[in-house]
Amino acid sequence: MRRLGPFHPRVHWAAPPSLSSGLHRLLFLRGTRIPSSTTLSPPRHDSLSLDGGTVNPPRVREPTGREAFGPSPASSDWLPARWRNGRGGRPRARLCSGWTAAEEARRNPTLGGLLGRQRLLLRMGGGRLGAPMERHGRASATSVSSAGEQAAGDPEGRRQEPLRRRASSASVPAVGASAEGTRRDRLGSYSGPTSVSRQRVESLRKKRPLFPWFGLDIGGTLVKLVYFEPKDITAEEEEEEVESLKSIRKYLTSNVAYGSTGIRDVHLELKDLTLCGRKGNLHFIRFPTHDMPAFIQMGRDKNFSSLHTVFCATGGGAYKFEQDFLTIGDLQLCKLDELDCLIKGILYIDSVGFNGRSQCYYFENPADSEKCQKLPFDLKNPYPLLLVNIGSGVSILAVYSKDNYKRVTGTSLGGGTFFGLCCLLTGCTTFEEALEMASRGDSTKVDKLVRDIYGGDYERFGLPGWAVASSFGNMMSKEKREAVSKEDLARATLITITNNIGSIARMCALNENINQVVFVGNFLRINTIAMRLLAYALDYWSKGQLKALFSEHEGYFGAVGALLELLKIP
């Protein structure tokens, strides 16, 4: 045989006669000149396999005369494991003695270029080495499927996947191929409007997290959960949807109560909402924090972990229960900052509204039960605002813009204090029961007022006689202790906590020079007494300069912010 000039000076080539035309064709495409006297001999045992055809690999003359690629195909154990087994998966081209084409391409750049050209021809539908290319870019079904198998099994094939899809757009399906099979094989190869639409859908799917979409706010007293229920599920999506996902959606949306303590606030449901390109309803669910282990167990029973779900959670419980989520439910928690989620949630919910109604509202004539009105408020210019979050405790934030805010102060006397004291003083067992008792009580029998001390108003300092001078001040008297009812004690407790929060909020607003004060948090849920008292106190003590604002979804903003973080919505 003659030595081919363009190749390595120590390399000879040989190929079987049946493949000589294919080899000549490849060398011609590469621009390699082949002398007419070049001999193509039958293959040896250590030949290069390219999906059905064989070409002898380069042979290196060693001083000992031993063949470069091993003594025989049956004895290749002396080769390194990574050469015997390839690079993982099914290699595109392999030497029968165990060497991959990629390894040889590194040793011989010219051979590497030849093999690269062969891969390109295979991807363009040119068939196998030695098989004539069909005209007009058409390829046999066997060639296309072979290229697809290579791409699936080889890391290099995955890197060249975009090239394969673009090139395959010119191919024609094999006779007898089903329409569905053709559509799947040629996904993304259409050139009309349908192709653009399909590509956009696929792009959005890659950017969106997998269902289900949850946001969690695990507080000290209550857990708030928001769940997005997609309403635009296609027939194809429904067919591919796993049973555990269907079970979760049905369980959450078909029930109003979950066990003895879980509640879905149906009146707060946001309908026809668009999130991350999907249309659906946003559900709001709450349950006591002490039931969190039962919630985690339910997630395990419903096989949440098989859905690759990441729970975005905020609140102190995100740290407290992180290990339980991992060990019991096999679920990963993404812990988020509580105040960041709160700001994101309130701004987003205010922007989407409340099913055509205003999210924000205030009270007109709060001190007069007959004339008091709840009126909508347009928070179109929200900045600056003072945000008072009343949960178990209280945090007060000054918000100057979406990304510029600070925590001004807070207090430990919050909703948890009210409920805890009511449990001690009245024997109630639920927050709702405590509020119901407070609505029937009279706090003046418990508190010592200004008029109890001065006999009327304290005009010098502008203190009206009805103002509280000492919370629970009358309870120092044995006679008065015996005269009060549990309802009176509950009412006095509510007034005490609310007055303290209102006083701190007013001082913060004056110091920060902010006129809009927004009160949120689950302490205000179904708590009209506290809201009216806050509204009246701010208006009275500021002489009309401060306005107390409230929101319909008062306790769920942290959970909404966690959901937005899951979807990466600003």
Swiss-Prot record:
Residues spanning the signal sequence: none
Q: Where is the composition biased (Low complexity)?
A: 168-179
Motif position, Nuclear export signal: 268-275
List the record's Gene Ontology CC terms alphabetically.
cytosol; mitochondrial intermembrane space; mitochondrion; nucleus
Which residues in this protein are found as Phosphoserine? 168-169, 189
Q: Which residues form the active site?
A: 338
Locate the region Disordered: 34-94, 127-198
Gene Ontology molecular function? ATP binding; pantothenate kinase activity
Q: Where do Basic and acidic residues bias regions lie?
A: 155-164
Q: Which biological pathway?
A: Cofactor biosynthesis; coenzyme A biosynthesis; CoA from (R)-pantothenate: step 1/5
Annotated GO biological process:
aerobic respiration; angiogenesis; coenzyme A biosynthetic process; mitochondrion organization; pantothenate metabolic process; phosphorylation; regulation of bile acid metabolic process; regulation of fatty acid metabolic process
In chain numbering, the transit peptide falls at 1-31
Q: According to the UniProt record, what happens if one changes residue 134 to G? A: In NBIA1; no effect on enzyme activity or its mitochondrial localization
A further note on this protein reads: The HSS syndrome has been proposed to be renamed because of the unethical activities of Julius Hallervorden and Hugo Spatz during world war II.
Tell me which family the UniProt entry assigns to this protein. Belongs to the type II pantothenate kinase family.
Q: What is this protein called?
A: Pantothenate kinase 2, mitochondrial
